[in-house]
Amino acid sequence: MPRRRVIGQRKILPDPKFGSELLAKFVNIVMLDGKKSTAEKIVYGALNVAAEKSGKSHLEIFETALDNIRPQVEVKSRRVGGSTYQVPVEVRPVRRNALGMRWLVDAARKRGEKSMGLRLAQEIVDAADNKGTAVKKREDVHRMAEANKAFAHYRW
């Protein structure tokens, strides 16, 4: 542990189109090789397609999809006397958002549609309807935590 003062998290500017910090963070996660304008085109295009398909507003469908992906608990490995236990721990809000967005992008990249924009749009629509690969990932993590609830007293 460092002995100096704790450094706060950097403030990130809200995205120019919707004024949402969460969406700006999402654009940064989609971005590859520092190509932010390309990432913005992909995300905004995906949100347009998703909004058309669902009939909801852009931000509303994104928020709904993210809510359905964010994990509440996860498991962390903890070594106790020679054996390793998977200990369920609650996920902090900042990490919850980060994991949800990362899982959403990973699931979209593994899909079969033509362009990344379409893949992302379809994954957002699926996540908003509580189905899709990203939601399945969250369910798997929750199932692991539930299965290892007996080791919850090893929390640190």
UniProtKB/Swiss-Prot annotation:
Pfam families: Ribosomal_S7. One of its GO terms (cellular component) is small ribosomal subunit. Keywords: Ribonucleoprotein, Ribosomal protein, RNA-binding, rRNA-binding, tRNA-binding. GO terms for molecular function: rRNA binding; structural constituent of ribosome; tRNA binding. Coiled coil: none annotated. CDD domains: uS7_Bacteria. GO terms for biological process: translation. Belongs to the universal ribosomal protein uS7 family. One of the primary rRNA binding proteins, it binds directly to 16S rRNA where it nucleates assembly of the head domain of the 30S subunit. Is located at the subunit interface close to the decoding center, probably blocks exit of the E-site tRNA. Part of the 30S ribosomal subunit. Contacts proteins S9 and S11. This is Small ribosomal subunit protein uS7. It comes from Pseudoalteromonas translucida (strain TAC 125). The lineage of its organism: Bacteria, Pseudomonadati, Pseudomonadota, Gammaproteobacteria, Alteromonadales.
